[in-house]
From Swiss-Prot:
Species this protein is from: Influenza A virus (strain A/Fowl plague virus/Rostock/8/1934 H7N1)
Single GO MF annotation: RNA binding
Coiled-coil residue spans: none
Catalytic residues, chain numbering: 80, 108
Function: Plays a major role in the shutoff of the host protein expression by cleaving mRNAs probably via an endonuclease activity. This host shutoff allows the virus to escape from the host antiviral response. Hijacks host RNA splicing machinery to selectively target host RNAs containing introns for destruction. This may explain the preferential degradation of RNAs that have undergone co- or post-transcriptional processing.
Domain writeup: The probable endonuclease active site in the N-terminus and the basic amino acid cluster in the C-terminus are important for the shutoff activity. The C-terminus acts as a nuclear localization signal. The C-terminus is recruited to host protein complexes involved in nuclear Pol II RNA processing.
Official protein name in the record: Protein PA-X
Keyword terms of this UniProt record: Decay of host mRNAs by virus, Eukaryotic host gene expression shutoff by virus, Host cytoplasm, Host gene expression shutoff by virus, Host mRNA suppression by virus, Host nucleus, Host-virus interaction
Primary subcellular site in the record, as a coarse category: host cell
Gene that specifies this protein: PA
Lipoprotein listed as a keyword: no
Family of this protein: Belongs to the influenza viruses PA-X family.
Taxonomic lineage of the native organism: Viruses, Riboviria, Orthornavirae, Negarnaviricota, Polyploviricotina
Length: 252
């Protein structure tokens, strides 16, 4: 699974996932399913934000090619992927600037158009079950929840899906592709079932051979993407936020 993750996801997503796990004392080489889950969640958060801007009137704009107009501002502030101290600093800055209620838990995004924090969920189970778990944990009507599944299902607070259908379809397609690629390599069952994951871990620890069927090289093509993860207070006129060029899983 670890080798699959490193081949399947953009290197910066992998690096951010590793830092996140190490921050909590977890080892990506051992807890490989969690490693895959974190990378997937990060990618969905970045895809959610990608290409979406707002103009000076606060109207939503989608810009998919070239540099956006200087008057446009990224619609979403990406909080996920930052270390906890930086993330809370960003959240506090947003709350102080906009007057929105400070969330109890770190959210994943902030939507400048709708003026709300967003919690993104990616589940291997039923979307409504995971949605209820998120809602019970957050216990706040101020934070918007949007859940995606690997089967193409989604669920959001008050059925408000925030993004246009095409943007959401791009996320669903990517998740379905990840599922298919995992399944083709015999990794999906262990990714879904904790019991199967433990069995697979024991098997992996006994074997030192690399995952079969995975290419040695990955194409590093880039789209309008990954600029910088700057603290938002350093440049009030910034137009750059965390961007990523998402590599699709290499075909067998």
């Amino acid at each position: 699974m670890e080798e699959f993750v490193r081949q399947c996801f953009n290197p910066m997503i992998v690096e951010l996932a590793e830092k996140t796990m190490k921050e909590y004392g977890e080892d990506p080489k051992i807890e490989t399913n969690k490693f895959a889950a974190i990378c997937t969640h990060l990618e969905v958060c970045f895809m959610y934000s990608d290409f979406h801007f707002i103009d000076e009137r606060g109207e939503s704009k989608i810009v998919e090619s070239g540099d956006p107009n200087a008057l446009l501002k990224h619609r979403f502030e990406i909080i996920e992927g930052r270390d906890r101290t930086m993330a809370w600093t960003v959240v506090n800055s947003i709350c102080n600037t906009t007057g929105v209620e400070k969330p109890k838990f770190l959210p994943d995004l902030y939507d400048y158009k709708e003026n709300r924090f967003i919690e993104i969920g990616v589940t291997r189970r039923e979307v409504h079950i995971y949605y209820l778990e998120k809602a019970n944990k957050i216990k706040s009507e101020k934070t918007h929840i949007h859940i995606f599944s690997f089967t193409g299902e989604e669920m959001a607070t008050k059925a408000d899906y925030t993004l246009d259908e095409e943007s959401r379809a791009r996320i669903k397609t990517r998740l379905f592709t990840i599922r298919q690629e995992m399944a083709s390599r015999g990794l999906w069952d262990s990714f879904v079932s904790p019991r199967e994951a433990k069995r697979q871990l024991k098997k992996d620890l006994k074997s030192q051979e690399p995952c079969a069927g995975l290419p040695n090289k990955v194409s590093h093509r880039t789209s309008p993407a990954l600029k910088t993860l700057e603290p938002m207070w350093m440049d009030s006129n910034r137009t750059a936020a965390l961007r990523a060029s998402f590599l699709k899983c290499p075909k067998k």
